[in-house]
């Protein structure tokens, strides 16, 4: 907007480094923690905890917050190089340390710490490291004394020999009993099987004979039923004279066609017509079939001169 823009007056705060909140002792959180027994510089939690040995000076300091400038999840590592730092930063820090009056030994120790941190970061990015957290000590549930298990070698040898002899005797007895049982079973099976052989053979023969006779009777009955069904007159007796006329016409046409070409198919004298709704249409269907089987009728249908 230039000069026409509204003026905005900004004042420098009295705490540019934002350290008053950490140094103040009148805050609500400081009062509660001090009432519970906490003092500035002490650790949080139980003093006799299992992980108390892992506390360092950083555990008593304030929590450090890192600004999140990406959309990655919590705990995710960015793909950028963790060693991407301004060049010469370590040397500049060492120079500032010398100006502040630090000794060379302190500066070398700090530089070594920085180098170790760089190596650890590089190794963590290249080879994924696994960090373990101590969760207590493992202890055996039952402490078994080894003195009770230890015995003299002579006694052990004697006990092994006795056990070996007992095992041999048991195996021999088991073998003898198994042989006896097998022989008894074989004798019983022979006695039982020798008696009913003749009876079984006679029974099986009689059963087969009965089955054969029943099968023959069933076949005869089926044949008689089929013959009766074929010999029964068709329900349409009024069409007999018309059938005779059509058959005579067909015979004449067939004789004529035999001279010219061989017959396509044989015409059955007895044709079974369907029952039901096709009863009235049976005549027309039969005439169409007969016309299609004759060459002259086909020529007449297609208006071809013979």
Swiss-Prot record:
> Where is there biased composition of kind Basic residues?
1-11, 219-228
- Keyword line: Nucleus, Ribosome biogenesis, rRNA processing
Which GO terms of the molecular function aspect are on file? nucleic acid binding
Q: What is its main location?
A: nucleus
Return the annotated region ranges for Disordered.
1-27, 148-241
GO CC annotation terms, alphabetical: nucleolus
- Basic and acidic residues biased stretches: 182-191
As for subcellular location, the record says: Nucleus, Nucleolus
What is the recorded function of this protein according to its Swiss-Prot or TrEMBL entry? Involved in rRNA-processing at A0, A1 and A2 sites and negatively regulates telomerase.
Q: Can you say what this protein is called?
A: Protein pxr1
Q: What is the organism of origin for this protein?
A: Aspergillus oryzae (strain ATCC 42149 / RIB 40)
């Amino acid at each position: 907007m230039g000069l026409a823009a509204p003026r905005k007056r900004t004042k420098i705060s009295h705490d540019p480094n934002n350290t008053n909140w950490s140094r103040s002792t009148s805050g609500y959180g400081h009062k509660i923690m001090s009432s519970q027994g906490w003092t500035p510089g002490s650790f949080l939690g139980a003093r006799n905890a299992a992980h108390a040995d892992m506390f360092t000076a950083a555990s008593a300091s304030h929590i450090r917050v890192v600004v999140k400038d990406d959309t990655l999840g919590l705990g995710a590592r960015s793909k950028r190089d963790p060693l991407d730092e301004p060049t010469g930063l370590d040397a500049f820090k060492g120079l500032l340390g010398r100006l502040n009056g630090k000794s060379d030994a302190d500066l070398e120790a700090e530089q070594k710490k920085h180098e170790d941190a760089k190596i650890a970061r590089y190794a963590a990015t290249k080879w994924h490291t696994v960090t373990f957290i101590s969760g207590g000590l493992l202890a055996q549930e039952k402490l078994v004394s080894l003195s009770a298990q230890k015995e003299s070698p002579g006694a052990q040898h004697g006990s092994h020999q006795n056990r070996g002899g007992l095992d041999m005797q048991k195996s021999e007895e088991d073998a003898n009993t198994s042989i006896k049982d097998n022989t008894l079973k074989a004798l019983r099976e022979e006695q039982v099987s020798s008696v009913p052989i003749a009876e079984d053979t006679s029974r099986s023969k009689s059963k087969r004979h009965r089955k054969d006779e029943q099968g023959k009777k069933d076949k005869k009955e089926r044949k008689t039923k089929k013959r009766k069904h074929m010999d029964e007159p068709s329900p349409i007796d009024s069409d007999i004279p018309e059938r005779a006329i059509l058959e005579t016409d067909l015979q004449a046409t067939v004789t004529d066609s035999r001279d010219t070409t061989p017959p396509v198919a044989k015409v059955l004298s007895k044709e079974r017509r369907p029952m039901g709704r096709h009863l009235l249409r049976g005549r027309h269907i039969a005439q169409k079939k007969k016309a299609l089987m004759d060459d002259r009728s086909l020529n007449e249908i297609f208006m071809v001169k013979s």
